[in-house]
């Protein structure tokens, strides 16, 4: 199980954060689970009006994240799924998406929750999608990570008393 050793994050007083979720459209059953998990996590954190945007595929996530980071969002969550095929396309997409999202976060100071599944099989993706029978909920985890990081950034930018 890849989730072994995951931290238990405690996130409080974040209901005022502006959070955007960007989700790709490939592999709709997996994506529906990821989006549902992300929205559920936001609701549990008291963030009831997130922005939800859809993009064609995972490769489009970084450019939309970059624009949103410049529009006052406190955290962004990128959701997608890339499943290995018989060509190097998988490697190029995974590397481009990962590098692009990290670059957005580092350059803008806005945390980007990484909820992009990079799997060898559809079964692996379904097992991480947060749907019935899944062992993990990566949409929920990506939100928690992004919001927890935004809360940390907010705490270090506030004046010390």
From Swiss-Prot:
It catalyses: (2S)-2-hydroxy-3-oxobutyl phosphate + 5-amino-6-(D-ribitylamino)uracil = 6,7-dimethyl-8-(1-D-ribityl)lumazine + phosphate + 2 H2O + H(+). GO terms for biological process: riboflavin biosynthetic process. The active site is at 89 (proton donor). GO terms for molecular function: 6,7-dimethyl-8-ribityllumazine synthase activity. InterPro entries: LS (IPR034964), LS/RS (IPR002180), LS/RS_sf (IPR036467). 5-amino-6-(D-ribitylamino)uracil binds at residues 26, 58-60, 81-83, 114. Its EC number is 2.5.1.78. Pfam families: DMRL_synthase. Belongs to the DMRL synthase family. This is 6,7-dimethyl-8-ribityllumazine synthase. It comes from Streptomyces coelicolor (strain ATCC BAA-471 / A3(2) / M145). The gene is ribH.
